[in-house]
Amino acid sequence: MRRESSTVVALAGPVRAELLAGLSRSPNISVVGGGAPAESANGQPSGEQDWEPGARAMREAARRRSTYVVVADDPLAGVAAAWRAMWDLNTGAQGAAGFEDQAAQALAAWRGKQFELPDYYLLVPEPAGSAGADLHLGPLRAARPRRVALATIAPADREGAGLLASLRSLEHGPWWPPLDDLLDAARTFFAGGLTETQSYPT
């Protein structure tokens, strides 16, 4: 369990650069992550695992002393993408295998104390028509409803006002269960039961 004085909030979803820039200008808010993927010495992608950018950002967030530290990289990003793909009927058995691979990598890193989960996940709305099965709105929110929130962001918002208001509305709740319990819950969670979407309002 995290014990730092700052509240660490990880953003999930398509985060526009101007929203992060707007947040970074707000008093008592630090923004971490959201940069380009890491490259190797020859300028090619480094081949790092999907949890690593989020883990680095979470470690950096732990060193900040702002009231809120907003993290634009999620250590569970690979798990979330694989969970969504698993519900795509076109992927077949490969979808489930991909999820298990990502889950094993993230769980090993978490057990190795490479990262901890943020205090909260704040979901950035996706463009209408592109939303699908979502790990955060599904099994994670079912496990800890007050640890996952859907941001209210208008498409015309360029300064992060919606994100800022969403940060201030977060409610305290029980801490996360162990990551292996969350992953087990994801294996049995029925994505078709989701009643809330994460699309922009029309």
What is the predicted role of each segment?
Residues M1-V8:
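Extreme N-terminal, non-catalytic leader segments
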Residues L11:
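Hydrophobic anchor at the beta1->P-loop junction of P-loop NTPases
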Residues S46-E116:
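Glycine-rich phosphate-binding loop used to anchor ATP phosphates in small-molecule kinases
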Residues V69, Y120-L123:
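Short, well-ordered beta-strand core segments
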Residues P14, L20-S66:
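Conserved substrate/cofactor phosphate-moiety recognition/catalytic segment
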Residues R2, V15-R16, P127-T202:
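NTP-dependent small-molecule kinase module
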Residues F115-Y120, P145-V148:
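Short glycine-/polar-rich loops that comprise or flank the Walker A/P-loop
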Residues E18-L19, A77-A81, S130:
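Short catalytic/ligand-binding loop motif for oxyanion handling, primarily in non-cytosolic enzymes
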